[in-house]
C-alpha cells in the first residue's frame, strides 16, 4: 500500500511542471551559476587540465547523478517544501534537516544576490558607459569604487532580488518554468557565439591548452577533493533546491531521464564556461585567475580591444545575469515554498517577506 503522501488524492493537491523540458531547463538553470564562468575554468586549468576534467565528469555522471536523482525523488514523494518532505518521509525529528536547508538557501541567496547585482550594474555600464572598458587600470579602479559604495551595492542588489522575486511570485508555471524556457536557450546561444569569436583570436590555443592539456604533475589529492566539491556545488544538491523543484513533478515523470539531462547540461556548461573566457584571456596574455577580477576587469578589457567590444560586453554580462538569476530563483523558491507550505503564506506575501 502506498503511503498517504503518494496517493492520487495527495498528488493532485500540488502544482506540476507543465512539461519535462520545463523542469529540465529550470533544474539546469538552478545548477548553472556564476561558478561555471568565474570559478571552474581556473580551477580546471590550475589543477592539471584534462586530468582534473576527467574525474569531475565521471563524478558528475555517477555520484552527482545519483545524489540529484535521490533528492528529486524525495521531493516528488514529499510533495511539499523541504521541511514538509523530511517530516512526511522521515518523521518529525527529520524536519530539522529541512530547516537547515531553508536557512542555507536563504544565507547563500543573501550574498549571491549581491554578486548578481554586480552583473546588472556592469550590464548597465556596458550599455550606456562603454568608454571605461578600454583601460584596464580604469576598470580596476571602477570595480574597486563600485564595491566600496554602499549605495551602488544596495541599489544593484535590490534590483537583482526584485527581478528574482517577480519570477518566483508568478509561480512555478508562469514564472520559473517560463523563465527557464526563455533564458536557458538564450544563454546557450550567447555563450556559443562568444566562444566561436574567442576561438578565432590569435594565440587562443593557449587557453585550450590550459584547459585540456594532460598535466598530472598539477593534480593531487586536494585537486580530487576540489573536483568532488565542485560536482556537488555545480549540481546544486544538498541544500534542498532540487528537492523543492522535485516536489512539483507528477508521479508519471521519468526522473532518470530528467535528472540525467540536468547533469549533462550542467557538466557541459562548466566546460563551455572555460571555453567562454580562457581562449580570449590567453590571446591577450592576461592573468587567468578566477573570481571577480576575471569577470569584471579582465574580460571587459578583452572586449574593449575590438570595435564591436560593446556588443560582446553586453552579451557577456547578459550571460552572467541569466546564469545568476536562474540559480537565485531556485534558492528563493526553496524559502518561499517553506513559508507557503509550513506557515500558510500566500505566494506573493512569501516572496515579499523573503526578499525584505
PLM region descriptions:
Residues 56-65, 102-127, 156-170, 185-198, ...:
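Hydrophobic core segments of alpha-helical transmembrane domains in multi-pass membrane transport
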Residues 2-38, 65-72, 76-89, 95-99, ...:
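Membrane-interface "cap" regions at the ends of multi-pass membrane proteins
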Residues 12-17, 177, 181-325, 329, ...:
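Membrane-embedded translocation segments of transport machinery
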Residues 15, 44-70, 152-153, 269-272:
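Extracellular loop-to-transmembrane helix junctions
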Residues 22, 49-56, 94-110, 177-187, ...:
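Alpha-helical transmembrane segments and their helix-start/interface "positive-inside/aromatic belt" motifs
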Residues 22-28, 98-102, 130-170, 236-243, ...:
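Transmembrane alpha-helical segments of multi-pass small-molecule transport proteins
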Residues 8-16, 42-47, 77-100, 113-173, ...:
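Inter-helical loop and helix-membrane interface segments of multi-pass membrane transporters/permeases
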Residues 46-51, 77-81, 91-94, 247-257, ...:
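Juxtamembrane helix-boundary/capping and inter-helix hinge elements in multi-pass membrane proteins
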Amino acid at each position: 500500500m502506498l503511503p498517504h503522501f503518494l496517493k492520487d488524492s495527495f498528488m493532485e493537491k500540488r502544482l506540476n511542471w507543465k512539461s519535462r523540458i520545463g523542469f529540465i531547463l529550470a533544474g539546469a538553470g538552478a545548477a548553472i551559476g556564476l561558478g561555471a564562468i568565474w570559478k571552474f575554468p581556473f580551477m580546471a586549468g590550475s589543477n592539471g587540465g584534462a586530468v582534473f576534467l576527467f574525474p569531475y565528469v565521471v563524478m558528475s555522471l555517477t555520484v552527482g547523478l545519483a545524489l540529484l536523482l535521490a533528492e528529486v525523488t524525495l521531493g516528488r514523494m514529499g510533495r511539499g517544501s523541504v521541511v514538509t518532505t523530511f517530516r512526511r518521509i522521515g518523521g518529525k525529528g527529520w524536519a530539522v534537516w529541512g530547516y537547515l536547508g531553508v536557512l542555507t538557501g536563504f544565507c547563500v541567496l543573501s550574498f549571491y544576490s549581491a554578486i548578481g547585482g554586480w552583473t546588472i550594474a556592469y550590464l548597465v555600464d556596458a550599455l550606456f558607459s562603454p568608454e571605461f572598458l578600454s583601460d584596464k587600470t580604469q576598470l580596476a579602479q571602477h570595480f574597486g569604487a563600485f564595491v566600496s559604495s554602499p549605495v551602488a551595492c544596495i541599489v544593484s542588489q535590490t534590483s537583482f532580488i526584485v527581478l528574482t522575486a517577480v519570477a518566483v511570485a508568478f509561480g512555478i508555471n508562469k514564472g520559473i518554468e517560463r523563465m527557464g524556457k526563455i533564458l536557458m536557450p538564450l544563454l546557450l546561444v550567447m555563450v556559443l557565439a562568444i566562444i566561436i569569436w574567442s576561438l578565432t583570436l590569435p594565440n587562443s590555443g593557449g587557453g585550450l591548452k590550459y584547459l585540456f592539456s594532460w598535466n598530472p604533475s598539477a593534480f593531487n589529492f586536494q585537486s580530487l577533493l576540489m573536483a568532488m566539491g565542485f560536482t556537488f556545488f555545480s549540481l546544486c544538491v544538498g541544500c534542498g533546491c532540487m528537492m523543492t523543484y522535485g516536489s512539483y513533478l507528477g508521479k508519471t515523470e521519468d526522473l532518470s531521464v530528467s535528472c540525467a539531462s540536468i547533469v549533462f547540461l550542467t557538466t557541459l556548461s562548466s566546460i563551455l564556461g572555460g571555453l567562454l573566457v580562457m581562449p580570449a584571456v590567453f590571446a591577450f596574455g592576461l592573468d587567468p585567475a578566477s573570481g571577480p577580477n576575471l569577470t569584471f576587469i579582465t574580460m571587459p578589457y578583452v572586449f574593449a580591444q575590438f570595435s564591436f567590444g560593446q556588443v560582446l560586453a553586453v552579451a557577456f554580462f547578459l550571460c552572467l545575469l541569466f546564469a545568476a538569476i536562474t540559480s537565485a530563483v531556485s534558492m528563493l523558491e526553496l524559502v518561499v515554498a517553506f513559508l507557503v507550505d509550513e506557515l500558510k503564506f500566500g505566494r506573493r506575501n512569501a516572496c515579499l517577506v523573503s526578499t525584505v
